[in-house]
């Protein structure tokens, strides 16, 4: 077959392939049980965990709002802390007041933590003993939380009139310890199916990059500001009186240097002028190597994950086309192959059967009853049988999609499965005098191959779809097993089969 005719088959496959995200953005609710909290085994499993008096549940919506509010304060601290450390020799009154207010909120959170139960990592049970809560907190993050909340600037005023001692400024940087809350927040959001994973991941990468740029620019400016000769600094070489310029000009200049260095643009207009700046530049560029590798690795993983199914799809379709051309298969068979591959990839993306397989049998039975009970009950073969028999039947059935012009059962084959047409269209074909003729068209809700399955003889017709069809399938072994368990229903089925085929 000419290559041009084979290439014309590609448009019939690609439109039905959707590689979009089907995860987080389609869910409006999440599991209604708290993270990491599992009930114990045995008779006590039904007993809900009881909180002691004055304790605050970590899953209380009000506590969640409090944690979200603290995240906003952490973002503020992450921005203002390096800025104060580098640019503000004499801390203005406004940031000083705001910092004390923010420290007050985190001091309240420290006290509140002594009244918040925690989940034990070994038993996965909620520990609500106040003594155990206190011991755990005192032996873990308590010291760091206190150090990040102490108002070191106010303490420095006792030793220095303006409070710009460099040692106390270093201690004030301990407020960056609060960033661990942001890391925990991103880890929690990445597991939340209500949010798109790729968006959360990209937001995290952008946040890390912006914070690194901000800190590097502030530190580099601090080195220039503390250098004895201002003109022999990276900023003093182009702005001799940079200390007299406004805060905004100096901050933008520092961020400009940081970004051009991080991106290895290196225009050369701002560069190190002394040994201190050279040493910091070396350290910053070495850090940039790690940061760039981290960013590229994460972005590559996101892109590869989103395009891997498309790549696999193209490879399989190309292999099928080459196989058909190499073996000179008829165009009809090649179309069936490509349509089947296209449909298989689309249904694999839906992951319907995989979703059902991971569920308990009782839950699968409820879902099957809701979806297929009335369809199976309406088939002529099962008229008059008990509801229990129909329920057993639909539980064992599997829903499949068949592409147009795909053969379900071939004439003279002994079918091993019974099929039920749910939706779509199927032609019943018969070979007469060497030609294929349409005997009739099967209606929705009609059984296919029941005579061959129940009578164990070759099928008299070929069943071929004419458009995309949804079909229920059950194996002959499972069907006969259910009939043997329900002998009265088996007699009804035998009677229905004889009446139709008399």
Curated annotation (Swiss-Prot):
Membrane topology: Multi-pass membrane protein
Pfam short name (any one): Ion_trans
Cytoplasmic compartment residues: 1-67, 117-138, 191-204, 298-502
Single GO cellular component term: monoatomic ion channel complex
Keywords, sorted A to Z: Ion channel, Ion transport, Membrane, Potassium, Potassium channel, Potassium transport, Transmembrane, Transmembrane helix, Transport, Voltage-gated channel
PROSITE patterns reported for this sequence: CNMP_BINDING_3 (PS50042)
Record topology, Extracellular segments: 89-95, 160-169, 226-252, 273-276
Binding site for a nucleoside 3',5'-cyclic phosphate: 381-500
Compartment list: Membrane
SMART domains noted in UniProt: cNMP (SM00100)
Record-annotated membrane-spanning stretches: 68-88, 96-116, 139-159, 170-190, 205-225, 277-297
InterPro entries registered for this protein in UniProt: cNMP-bd_dom (IPR000595), cNMP-bd_dom_sf (IPR018490), Ion_trans_dom (IPR005821), K_chnl_volt-dep_EAG/ELK/ERG (IPR003938), KAT/AKT (IPR045319), RmlC-like_jellyroll (IPR014710)
Gene Ontology molecular-function annotations: voltage-gated potassium channel activity
Intramembrane segments per UniProt: 253-272
Record remark on domains: The segment S4 is probably the voltage-sensor and is characterized by a series of positively charged amino acids. The pore-forming region H5 is enclosed by the transmembrane segments S5 and S6 in the Shaker-type (1P/6TM) and contains the GYGD signature motif which seems to be involved in potassium selectivity.
Family recorded in the similarity comment: Belongs to the potassium channel family. Plant (TC 1.A.1.4) subfamily.
Primary role: Probable inward-rectifying potassium channel. Assuming opened or closed conformations in response to the voltage difference across the membrane, the channel is activated by hyperpolarization.
Name of the featured protein: Potassium channel KAT3
Organism of this sequence: Oryza sativa subsp. japonica
